């Protein structure tokens, strides 16, 4: 009888254990990160980095992944991720990849995306900082 009680107590402890992980304090936000919200609801984070010099990285994370899909929609978020590289409103056909490669951003290495269970993230990394390049990369993020 004592073994059953001990086993039951152990089982309850293991079931309750994950709730402790939920009580961890939130991570502090880097004081150098500028955070804002656009009228359309998009939250943005901007941080200056000295290295690599005169280079910028652009990311857009969308709360879209397998968890939000219905059974009839399985794989849709991942499919749309791939389609974004096949042309957008402002970069039809392969113009997006051609633009990026022309400025030294390599497809697959510096220009990429992934879809997980709860997010889809697109990135353009190691972009040479010029007004034109920054404007074009922001336009790409807009299209995605």
Descriptions of predicted regions:
Residues 8-18:
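Bacterial N-terminal signal peptides
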Residues 3, 18-19:
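Acidic, low-complexity intrinsically disordered regions
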Residues 1-8:
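Bacterial N-terminal signal peptides that target proteins for export
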Residues 26-60:
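Mature N-terminal segment immediately following signal peptide/propeptide cleavage
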Residues 62-77, 81-144:
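Active-site-adjacent, His/Asp/Glu-enriched structural segments that form or flank metal-binding
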Residues 12, 34, 72-75:
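Hydrophobic/aromatic side chains embedded in well-ordered alpha-helices
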Residues 7, 25, 30, 83, ...:
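Short, functionally important structural connectors and interaction interfaces within domains
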